[in-house]
């Protein structure tokens, strides 16, 4: 699957325990997206365009109205990246 660098960075953050919080307007349409890492930092690579691409490819999903998390398909699409945490 062809995944861009911002999509790859977002998926990697989600695979390590992050989440995507969304904000909706009065018509229940998504107006803002925030990708929060496991450590609580905000990932700037995750914007509305990246979010829509990941959702349309079904690499992320939301359960019971909660934050968006990575799916099994998303985990399979993530390329391994070295982890500098020791």
Swiss-Prot record:
Protein name in UniProt: UPF0386 protein RC1_1783
HAMAP family in the record: UPF0386 (MF_00827)
Domain of life: Bacteria
Bridged cysteine pairs (disulfide): none
Organism from which the protein derives: Rhodospirillum centenum (strain ATCC 51521 / SW)
Transmembrane segments: none
Pfam families, alphabetized: YjhX_toxin
Family according to the record: Belongs to the UPF0386 family.
């Amino acid at each position: 699957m062809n995944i861009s660098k911002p999509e790859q960075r977002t998926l990697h953050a989600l695979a390590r325990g992050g989440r995507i919080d969304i904000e909706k307007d009065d018509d229940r349409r998504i107006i803002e997206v925030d990708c929060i890492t496991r450590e609580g930092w905000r990932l700037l690579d995750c914007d509305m365009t990246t979010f829509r691409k990941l959702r349309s490819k079904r690499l992320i999903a939301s359960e019971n109205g909660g934050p968006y998390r990575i799916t099994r398909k998303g985990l399979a699409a993530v390329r391994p990246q070295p982890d500098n945490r020791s």
